[in-house]
Amino acid sequence: MPDVSKSPLAPRRFPRIPGVAGVRLAVAAAGIKYKRRNDLLLAALPQGTTAAGVFTRSGTASAPVIWCRDNITSGRARALLVNSGNANAFTGDRGMHDVRWSATRVAKALACRPAGVLVASTGVIGEPLPVHRIDTVFPRLIGELGNASWYQAARAITTTDTFPKGAYRRCQIGNTEITVAGIAKGSGMIAPNMATMLAFVFTDARIPAAVLRSVHSATVDRSFNCITVDSDTSTSDTSILVATGQARNAEPESISDRALKNFKQALLEVYVDLATQVVKDGEGASKFITIDVEGATSNTAARKVGLAIAESPLVKTAIAGEDANWGRIVMAVGKSQAQVDQQLLSVSMGGVLIAHRGQRVAGYTESIVDQHLTGSEIEITVNLGLGAGRARVWTCDLTHEYIRINAEYRT
Amino acid sequence: MPDVSKSPLAPRRFPRIPGVAGVRLAVAAAGIKYKRRNDLLLAALPQGTTAAGVFTRSGTASAPVIWCRDNITSGRARALLVNSGNANAFTGDRGMHDVRWSATRVAKALACRPAGVLVASTGVIGEPLPVHRIDTVFPRLIGELGNASWYQAARAITTTDTFPKGAYRRCQIGNTEITVAGIAKGSGMIAPNMATMLAFVFTDARIPAAVLRSVHSATVDRSFNCITVDSDTSTSDTSILVATGQARNAEPESISDRALKNFKQALLEVYVDLATQVVKDGEGASKFITIDVEGATSNTAARKVGLAIAESPLVKTAIAGEDANWGRIVMAVGKSQAQVDQQLLSVSMGGVLIAHRGQRVAGYTESIVDQHLTGSEIEITVNLGLGAGRARVWTCDLTHEYIRINAEYRT
């Protein structure tokens, strides 16, 4: 992990996340890449746990992603093994062999099938996974099951992250108290669909696999698929949601079951919390940017415009420089390829209307917006004036520190 | 123009470009934004000049782009007026009015129709064009026609450029000697389709408008549409090719006329020369990167992969840091959304095969590639192993200087 101090946008502290019934965590230091820190996480899950996953759309997906995509179709999981420091990506047949070996190792210890062991890896691409190191610490990892905290788990999966990321919410399904708790990592190579971003969310709710899959996809779409740090899509992006069923709530029948309303909201809050923490740890980030797009022809078009703004290096550097260069926002809207009529386009920053229906508003004074830009939370609102489509997208600014981190990451 | 020293990748000197029969140039300092430098260029063209243009695909195209797109359909031009410092983009009705006013002013002086006057503007977006300043220097501009050099013309159209860009070639159509000469500007907001990039190329050849249009599009596709600096698409990108016909060669009938072979090659050389100069002046560039993609299912797919690599901030920062982080190249290939089979993928840098058919080659030693990366001209070759499609794409690295320039551009 490069020697970088904590992001100025980091939350003040890691939340006090309660346990999730049925989930037992363990961490270990295998020395895969990093020295003197935990880099392995194992989560054991009880029988009957349902699981859903969303993975990178990269054409060069990592071996663990290929493994998980194949195995999560069962909708079941008994364990989750995660390592940091090595992505096991672009490692050919050996990479697939190493995943199978790891899953089998966990399966034996937990008396389940290898297919029930989900695996995720994050770190350098193209280097073989040093499985012998994992092998050495494996007995200890198994022996420690149940002893690790969420904080330790969140730390073990980090790479260039400057702080561990966790979130939780309590909610109800019917009259049953439910806990939703999650951890995530990610700070660079962050873009939707998805990012070098791993997110693992655990709930004790009882949710059938098909329902869990729908809820998870819809939630990821409004959280991790609405963030970008640098527009680069990783080989390893993984979001996994597991439900242990230990809360014994009445089983919902579909995603539209009214009993799920409170749960879906809690889940979305956990995902948005984790996703925005990833952005707040965006490599070199000094400002957190929320972009609201309204008046698009559809929600999809709105997100397209939002992401075009969020991914523009020129918008992001202007904000880093606290420069109210709103012309670059117009440029980014233009390049989005979404339907746009510049005569109807309005742009605001920090709640101040700068341009309305195709031109700068009369009497616009930059000083108020400049004031807003000196803060660390920046708001951009774009109204396309075409329809009812809307989306909210989050990103961070592009600073010298991003360059420093990424020009020095591997060496 | 921010106080930045000349790009380390700049050519040693501006070429000694000969005159093009029929083209008369003038420059003037209107003080649109910059002080004490020329910011207006006028090129007068003789009757019978044919013209072709390619413009930004931005949904928020500038007023001059809208004007040119409408008027170039005639295939004729009598003048070209260019200003730097203000893009006249997102300026509403007033912007269109200002273009019409400028064109009419030139048309009166040259006794032609306003529709024959092509206009281009580059600079800040969203601020009204200060036409009164142009008005003041206008008589002088007309009076100076024929007195400006290519060097002066190339300098007058620059914004954040650290050096003026020009190129020329001589060739033959039949037995007639032909000159092709061009100037360009651009250094940021550079991406294909196109970039804040203006290119104006002039030839004395006699080419019917329809043929000129085809030749121009094909040439832009293999030059300006194969470069990227920061993936941002400008509101103002313009490439215009004019042919004065003064060389009186036999008129070619189609783009496939054999007499054009030599001319097409010369034209492509001029465009690639200008396009790569734009990349070499990429904001903050310290390394010039040539990416060859082979084995794609089509040339279009190859270009898509090449641009995904060229636009990846993680690839560009790694190269800035002289780090042979080829895993990021694999990541970028994966995110391109072109057809990819990672089992067939090979990656080389500086001619050294690093990964072959889906994994790192046995015995690969990074030190040779590291050596290559210390140079200023970097070569990346990717073979997808799928077909005969190929493309060459150019970009530059992403450095601290990019951030510095763009966080401070406007203020």
What are these regions (language model features)?
Chain A
Residues 2-100, 107-411:
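A structural signal for small-residue-enriched, beta-sheet-centric alpha/beta enzyme cores
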